[in-house]
């Protein structure tokens, strides 16, 4: 089962289908159709947020799902499947892979990531685990904990990495990540062009996750508008 799931996403595109509660596309039905469109176009997997969305997507597609549960807690910056409560819910949702924040930041309620991993391995032995990391330190931490996949998901999205992009300096950071571990690396985070997706696979990543550049029309529209405005700067 686990090897089958791994093989299905190897070398392919996983499309992240998510919409925040304040966005027009926030709907499990809409996300399920977004996932269907992605799979019909060749996506080998889907990344989805919340049990409700995951179950709706499962009814539409038959590909591996990377499940997460975004939840904010006071006193902690960790919000991607932050506590065992969310981890357990996603493990029971039907998702084959559960992704969670694997940074060294303080987790809600003082929970420890190593303890969460031990519990999951015991209670849900068939679930694959993906570490969402932001730094080489995180990658080494996740590697030591035995994650099945390590993602670059949070590089550029934490206080310490604000403004950084995975493609900076010819993907220098990603190259260091790939050198630091033999655990399969899933490139994710600011992979916003087909060229970047192709390059990260060429460098040795196991697979690639793309979200906003495919499934977030507001972000896509803003990119067009911002680029179009450049030609009009200084003109009256």
Swiss-Prot record:
EC number(s) from the headed UniProt entry: 5.1.3.9
Record keywords, A-Z: Carbohydrate metabolism, Isomerase
Keyword Isomerase: yes
GO CC annotation terms, alphabetical: cytosol
Signal peptide location: none
UniProt similarity note: Belongs to the NanE family.
Name this polypeptide is given: Putative N-acetylmannosamine-6-phosphate 2-epimerase
Organism of this sequence: Listeria welshimeri serovar 6b (strain ATCC 35897 / DSM 20650 / CCUG 15529 / CIP 8149 / NCTC 11857 / SLCC 5334 / V8)
């Amino acid at each position: 089962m686990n090897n089958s799931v791994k093989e299905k996403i190897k070398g392919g595109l996983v499309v992240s289908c998510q919409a925040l509660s304040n966005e027009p596309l926030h709907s499990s039905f809409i996300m399920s159709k977004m996932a269907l469109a992605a799979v019909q176009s060749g996506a080998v997997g889907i990344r989805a947020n919340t049990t409700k969305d995951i179950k709706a997507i499962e009814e539409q597609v038959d590909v591996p799902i990377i499940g997460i549960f975004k939840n904010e807690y006071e006193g902690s910056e960790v919000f991607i499947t932050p506590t065992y409560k969310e981890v357990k819910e996603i493990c029971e949702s039907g998702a084959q892979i559960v992704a969670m924040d694997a940074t060294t930041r303080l987790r809600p309620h003082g929970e420890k990531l190593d303890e969460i991993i031990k519990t999951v391995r015991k209670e849900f032995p068939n679930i694959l685990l993906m570490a969402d990391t932001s730094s080489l330190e995180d990658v080494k931490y996740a590697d030591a904990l035995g994650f099945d996949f390590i993602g670059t998901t949070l590089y550029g999205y934490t206080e310490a990495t604000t403004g950084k992009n995975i493609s900076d300096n010819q993907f220098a950071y990603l190259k260091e990540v790939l050198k630091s571990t033999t655990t399969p690396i899933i490139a994710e985070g600011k992979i916003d062009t087909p060229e970047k997706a192709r390059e990260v696979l060429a460098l040795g990543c196991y697979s690639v996750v793309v979200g906003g550049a495919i499934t977030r029309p507001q972000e896509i529209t803003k990119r067009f508008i911002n680029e179009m405005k450049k030609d009009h700067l200084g003109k009256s």
